[in-house]
Each structure stands twice: as C-alpha cells, then as structure tokens.
Amino acid sequence: MGNKSKAYKAAAEKIDKGRLYTPLKAAELVKETSSKNCDATVDVAIRLGVDPRKADQLVRGTVSLPNGTGKSVRVAVFAEGEKATEAQAAGADIVGTTELIEQITAGTIEFDVAIATPDQMAKVGRVARVLGPRGLMPNPKTGTVTNDVAKAIAEVKGGKISFRVDKASNLHAIIGKASFDAEKLAENYGALLDEINRIKPSSAKGIYVKKVTLTSTFGPGVPVDPSIQKNYTQA
C-alpha cells in the first residue's frame, strides 16, 4: 500500500490542479500518470449544468467512439428462434431468455451490455430491478431494444457506449485505455462531448458543461478546460 501511495503521490505532483488542460494535454498526462502495472481504463467525469430531477433535463444517450473503448465487451441478448440464431452469428456472448433470466436472478452470470428484441421485453421486465440499478436494462432510447440484433451487437462491440447523468448532475464514461495514443483518447472525448452538446436540454440554463476531469484506473484526476468544444486534438 505504501508503494502505491508513493507512486500515486509522484503521479499527482505532475498535475497542476490549478490549471485547466487541453483535451490532448490531459490525455498525455493521464497516460503518463497511469499505473504501470496494467493497461488502465481511461474515464471522463463531466459535471453538467442540469437538474436531473426534472424529466426534460435527464441527459442520456449513446455515442460510437471513433477509436473504440479498448475493452472486450460481453454482450447478452434476450432473443428466441431466428433472432437468437442471428445474435449468435453476430458474436453475442450469451443468448437466451428464460435460462438467462434465471441466471440473472440467481446472480450467476455477468455481462457488460444487454440487448433484447421487443417481443422479449415483457419477460425481461422480471429482472428489471436487478438490471436497472446496474445500467443494464435494455432500452429503445439506447438502441438496445431492437429487432436488428446483429447491428446492435456490432455497434456495442465496436465502441458504442451509453451515458447518463446521475442524481448529482455528473456523467461518467469510458473513453479508452492508457495504451491508446493521446490523440485517440482526445478524439474519443471529443465525440462524447459533441454528442452531449447535441442533446443539450433546451430548458438548461447557464453554463452547460461546468467541469471535466480525465482519470485512469487508480490514477490522479486531470482537470480539462470545459470551454474547449472543438479541435480536441490540438495541444
């Protein structure tokens, strides 16, 4: 633990907390200060000027990151018959409905994304209390309730992520791995921020993107200038 603390402290000293970095410089610092023991995941935390208690200010959506997440995504698909066959052919990791629901209820299965065909949603509703709090409930708004299961699987495995503002007006998302080039991390961040800006609620007042922090697993946070909303790969 002591070594970790020393390593973290040394990494944190490289970051000027009183400065707001460009997305590219922040990505470079995240890479430089990430753990050397693993290929750390790079996350972004964004504070939005919205009131998520108001339905029209609940910011949520999806975006396909141009460079993917670098993460192997385990996909479960609720489907039967022909659609189940399509899902298996498209590379789904788990396919089924009744047995899958039983495994979810028993807590014996893990996956990162759930997709369902519309005709299976009544059954999926039985495990909504388990999937909902974990952000795994299929939803038409995120493209995870669909008859085109092959397309949905390809998008998710290719780097499509979902995001949603929480009760404290914060939004968290994975934008890659520490092994990515800094430019690729900045491009992924830019794609996410562009989509967040595109779906800005019309009722949101004042500054919309208030605070941005990039961080790697076990690494210190790097403050990003939230006013930079284009030319993300410029130093």
Curated annotation (Swiss-Prot):
Pfam families xref list: Ribosomal_L1
Subunit (UniProt): Part of the 50S ribosomal subunit.
Signal peptide start-end: none
Keywords, comma-separated and alphabetical: Repressor, Ribonucleoprotein, Ribosomal protein, RNA-binding, rRNA-binding, Translation regulation, tRNA-binding
A GO molecular-function descriptor: rRNA binding
Similarity remark: Belongs to the universal ribosomal protein uL1 family.
Function: Binds directly to 23S rRNA. The L1 stalk is quite mobile in the ribosome, and is involved in E site tRNA release.
Annotated PANTHER family: 54S RIBOSOMAL PROTEIN L1, MITOCHONDRIAL, LARGE RIBOSOMAL SUBUNIT PROTEIN UL1M
GO cellular component, one term: large ribosomal subunit
Gene Ontology biological process terms, A to Z: regulation of translation; translation
InterPro entries: Ribosom_uL1_bac-type (IPR005878), Ribosomal_uL1 (IPR002143), Ribosomal_uL1-like (IPR023674), Ribosomal_uL1/biogenesis (IPR028364), Ribosomal_uL1_3-a/b-sand (IPR016095), Ribosomal_uL1_CS (IPR023673)
Gene: rplA
Name listed for the protein in its UniProt record: Large ribosomal subunit protein uL1
